[in-house]
């Protein structure tokens, strides 16, 4: 009986043993879980093709380049598995035959020759380092079993690919391939695959950059085994043995540092894949370094390149030199808020085209103006009188742009830009005003480049794509026709050529901007495929006298454009939209008139949007007699008379807006254009027949303040002439409209006073204030 019980107990014990082992293993697994995530984070930012841009090592200075199995050459996987662990895909974590072989070798030699570790066991040791003792080997085997229970073979292999040591601060095949060979691990040759497969066995002793002879011998050993096992042919192995151990110049990735720093905050991934083109980025950074010597002291630059066909950012240079503290090299000026100067002007003209306010040949007024305390002027400090919209844009004149913005509405303009991703930054509490169009608000270069894509994307502004998986998002800014017209004007092709003469591929269209005080110089260009954004200036905001958009930013823009064109093929065409047609309009009215019509003082060919011919845009104060359609009353002899004269008949004549009179040839001024006045029933009273004269100060007079006076008071009178008076002091309009004016002068210097009447007669006087 006791014997029977003993037998039964043995059978029960044997039957329960697997269950007990399972419970023990399960408990141990819970008590000592795998440290899968216990690693200091090391991150890398890469270009779209996988080229490393910038590495961010972990706290221990370790650099990793995360890869998947698909990212690695099959040659490397063949060499690794067949040299290190032929039975990797079949064993449960440890290979008993390998362990037995290693134990026999160690015993017979009296020293450790082989550890018999499988790839899984090597991963186990990487995750949980342990001493090379018998107990350590048991612990390693236990961790290997845990790996096999929790992970698939592919996951275990991926861990090895990313955690294996390759010498120095390099971990993983990705980091090793880029650091030693300057190439992706997907493109390894047989020789390179063999060398990197054996390197983790003794990374310090076999480092190819320090011990190329040792690395070559170890590589050849791997190659020979691949031939013996029939994995690679003898011919392949022979050719590979003849290859020298070639290494790329060992240099950690150093491209797009400020962009890479920004991307760390936009992605949690250890490997952040971006849309940058590594080759282009390298060219841009070389250009920046070469340009550094041309910049004034403490100045920097910024460049951004956007492929407007898919909105991917292809190049980003945030400063001229990251390591130059005197130039604030650590400040990324691509996303800094700066005054854009005149760079916004194309947008207001395009929006005004869609609104039906203007067409490209619309007559605008480049004349002195004052709106409250705001007195805009031009960059060259002069005024040009009558000018077309297209010429005003090409010459970047300020007063015409202010005139159009006033008609469109500054608040509406700012809201339109904000809606497509171009916010304008105003001082706290400030509302959008007319100064917006001249740089009176801040903007970012990256946002400006994104908005300029509207001129190449049929009027739709896209959102910049920084990573390949970012969705393509866009919003309408203006019509396709308006975008096409403005782009052609910026390319200096405003003339409406026949379709056969239009270039199929759009030339470079560009616009400059210079902020107040020469603090910022901008240039934005749009070519057939790319939008290029350029900024130069001092990051601290101090002025750089003489540095303006055309002189400082345009040469750099042209250099970048040449680089892009040398790399581009099959550029997209830019056909004329059906909404854009050719037309001929007349000045000063702005619309078509028949041949021979006396109201057509000048004919201009132009592009028209949807066939629209809006009349000339007037300033808010230009109504009635001060506008273009001028009413006159004629007697039976064709002479001008007052409206209430007997038998007076009314006619309408097109005249130029009064503020343009000083810039018109004599034959176009009202005094010549209007029929002579009747002496019997004069239109403005009898004194209107007298010439316009100025009295109160003689020409060339010297004016001095009375002792103790803060200003000199100068009363002036006009006589003769007709209708209202328009007064200008040094080209700036005065608010008075009467026959007399009193000047209050405080500043010394030369002065010119001009008075004009409603029929265009002019009287002037010059004097000096001392």
Regions found by a protein language model. Name each.
Residues 2-7, 15, 232, 508-770:
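Soluble, non-transmembrane domains of envelope/secretory-pathway proteins that act on or interact
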Residues 89-99, 171-174, 234-236, 327, ...:
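Short, well-structured active-site flanking segments
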Residues 274-295, 305, 316-319, 324-333, ...:
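A penicillin-recognizing enzyme superfamily signal
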Residues 2-297, 308-314, 319, 367, ...:
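Juxtamembrane regions of bacterial inner-membrane/periplasmic proteins
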């Amino acid at each position: 009986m006791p014997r029977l019980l003993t037998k039964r107990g043995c059978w029960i014990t044997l039957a329960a043993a697997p269950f007990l082992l399972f419970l023990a293993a399960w408990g141990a697994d819970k008590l000592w879980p795998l440290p899968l995530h216990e690693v200091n984070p090391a991150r890398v930012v890469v270009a779209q093709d996988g080229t490393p841009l910038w590495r961010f090592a972990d706290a221990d200075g370790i650099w990793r380049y995360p890869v998947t199995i698909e990212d690695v050459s099959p040659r490397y996987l063949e060499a690794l598995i067949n040299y290190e662990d032929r039975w990797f895909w079949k064993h449960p974590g440890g290979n008993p035959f390998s362990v037995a072989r290693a134990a026999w070798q160690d015993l017979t030699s009296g020293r450790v020759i082989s550890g018999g570790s499988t790839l899984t066991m090597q991963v186990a040791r990487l995750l949980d380092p342990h001493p090379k003792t018998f107990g350590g080997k048991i612990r390693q085997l236990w961790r290997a079993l845990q790996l096999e229970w929790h992970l698939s073979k592919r996951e275990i292999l991926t861990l090895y690919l990313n955690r294996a040591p390759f010498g120095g601060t390099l971990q993983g095949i990705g980091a090793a391939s880029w650091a030693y060979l300057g190439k992706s691990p997907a493109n390894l040759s047989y020789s390179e695959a063999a060398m990197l497969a054996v390197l983790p066995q003794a990374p310090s002793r076999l480092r190819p950059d320090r011990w190329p002879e040792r690395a070559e011998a170890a590589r050849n050993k791997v190659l020979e085994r691949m031939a013996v096992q029939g994995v690679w042919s003898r011919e392949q192995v022979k050719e590979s043995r003849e290859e020298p151990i070639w290494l790329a110049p060992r240099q950690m990735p150093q491209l797009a540092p400020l962009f890479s720093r920004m991307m760390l905050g936009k992605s949690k991934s250890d490997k952040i894949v971006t849309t940058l083109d590594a080759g282009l980025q390298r060219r841009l950074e070389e250009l920046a370094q070469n340009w550094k010597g041309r910049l004034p002291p403490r100045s920097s630059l910024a460049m951004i390149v956007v492929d407007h066909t898919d909105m991917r950012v292809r190049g980003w240079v945030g400063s001229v030199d990251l390591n130059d503290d005197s130039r604030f090299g650590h400040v990324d000026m691509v996303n800094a808020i700066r005054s854009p100067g005149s760079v916004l002007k194309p947008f207001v003209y395009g929006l005004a085209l869609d609104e039906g306010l203007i067409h490209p040949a619309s007559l605008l007024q480049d004349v002195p103006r004052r709106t409250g305390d705001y007195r805009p002027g031009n960059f060259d400090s002069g005024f040009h009188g009558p000018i077309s919209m297209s010429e005003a844009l090409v010459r970047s004149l300020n007063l015409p742009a202010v005139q159009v913005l006033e008609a469109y509405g500054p608040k509406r303009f700012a809201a339109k830009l904000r809606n497509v991703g171009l916010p304008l930054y105003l001082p706290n509490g400030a509302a959008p005003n007319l100064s917006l169009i001249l740089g009176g608000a801040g903007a970012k270069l990256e946002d400006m480049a994104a908005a300029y894509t509207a001129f190449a994307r049929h009027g739709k502004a896209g959102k910049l794509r920084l990573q390949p998986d970012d969705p393509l998002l866009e919003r309408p800014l203006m019509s396709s026709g308006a975008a096409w017209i403005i782009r052609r004007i910026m390319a200096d092709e405003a003339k409406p050529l026949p379709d056969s003469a239009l270039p199929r591929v759009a030339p470079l269209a560009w616009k400059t901007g210079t902020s107040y005080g020469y603090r910022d110089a901008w240039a934005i260009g749009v070519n057939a495929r790319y939008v290029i954004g350029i900024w130069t200036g001092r990051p601290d905001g101090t002025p750089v006298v003489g540095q303006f958009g055309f002189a400082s930013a345009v040469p750099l823009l042209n250099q970048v454009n040449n680089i892009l064109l040398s790399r581009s093929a099959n550029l997209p065409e830019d056909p004329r939209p059906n909404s854009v047609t050719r037309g001929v309009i007349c000045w000063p009215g702005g619309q078509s008139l028949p041949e021979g019509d006396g109201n057509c003082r000048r004919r201009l060919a132009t592009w028209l949007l949807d066939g629209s011919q809006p009349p000339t845009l007037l300033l808010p104060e230009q109504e009635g007699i001060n506008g273009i359609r001028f009413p006159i009353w004629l007697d039976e002899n064709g002479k001008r008379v007052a409206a209430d004269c007997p038998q007076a008949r009314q006619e309408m004549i097109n005249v130029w807006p009064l503020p343009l009179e000083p810039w018109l040839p004599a034959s176009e001024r009202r005094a010549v254009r209007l029929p002579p006045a009747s002496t019997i029933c004069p239109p403005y009273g009898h004194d209107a027949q007298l010439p316009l004269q100025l009295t109160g100060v003689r020409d060339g007079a010297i004016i001095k303040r009375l002792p103790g006076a803060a200003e000199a008071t100068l009363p002036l009178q006009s006589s003769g002439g007709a209708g209202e008076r328009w007064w200008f002091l040094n080209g700036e309009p005065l608010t008075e409209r009467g026959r007399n004016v009193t000047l209050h002068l405080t500043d010394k210097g030369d002065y010119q006073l001009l008075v004009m009447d409603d029929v265009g007669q002019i009287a002037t006087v010059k004097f000096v204030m001392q």
